[in-house]
């Protein structure tokens, strides 16, 4: 009997040629499709197509399968050390993972930057705005709502988080570039006359989580918690080293 599932999974983005299938020799989607030996790539649907170089702790993909969730996770996790599936939820057939309640991205900033100065500028993005000046142009409606911005300090530096129902292409990275350029200044980011073309590096950006209020995801394996922690440490080490060496 075929069941439909959402799987939460993470990946180290800089180890791939991009996210979307067909994007170079080794994309994240192509890696999953190849691992599961799927005859039809359309059997996989994804919640977020992250920019090249962006990592994730909890993206979501949808699949219909006769296999057990444990088997799906085991196959993917055993075939690539840079992708890990860590939890699942059974859903109705045909459900689109893109329609979520909240997506949260976090951006890691090594060094002595203070949260207070970042938040002064970042707070200008809160609320419902036209983000066409802070995204790469496509056919989608550019109006988006930033529901929450948070900042906290870690041992390596600070982490800035953005939560919204959806984001546009390059939106978070352009917002970050603006915040870093004008940090400490309380200005209206939407008062800029032209498209803001600066963009923050992708390697520091991580898709932290995707929330569906009606779903409760079940962890697949205690060992995967350890694997997730190892991936977090690997990302932090890479980001810190990259910022030190340039």
Curated annotation (Swiss-Prot):
Lineage: superkingdom: Archaea
Protein name: tRNA pseudouridine synthase A
One Pfam family this sequence matches: PseudoU_synth_1
Keyword terms, alphabetized: Isomerase, tRNA processing
Gene3D superfamilies reported in the protein's UniProt record: Pseudouridine synthase I, catalytic domain, C-terminal subdomain
Biological process terms in GO annotation: tRNA pseudouridine synthesis
Keyword Manganese: no
Enzyme class name: isomerase
Catalyzed chemical reaction(s): uridine(38/39/40) in tRNA = pseudouridine(38/39/40) in tRNA
Gene: truA
Amino-acid positions noted as binding substrate in the UniProt annotation, renumbered to this chain: 105
GO molecular function: RNA binding; tRNA pseudouridine(38-40) synthase activity
Family, as annotated: Belongs to the tRNA pseudouridine synthase TruA family.
Active site: 51
Protein purpose: Formation of pseudouridine at positions 38, 39 and 40 in the anticodon stem and loop of transfer RNAs.
Taxonomic source organism: Thermoplasma volcanium (strain ATCC 51530 / DSM 4299 / JCM 9571 / NBRC 15438 / GSS1)
Ubl conjugation recorded as keyword: no
EC id: 5.4.99.12
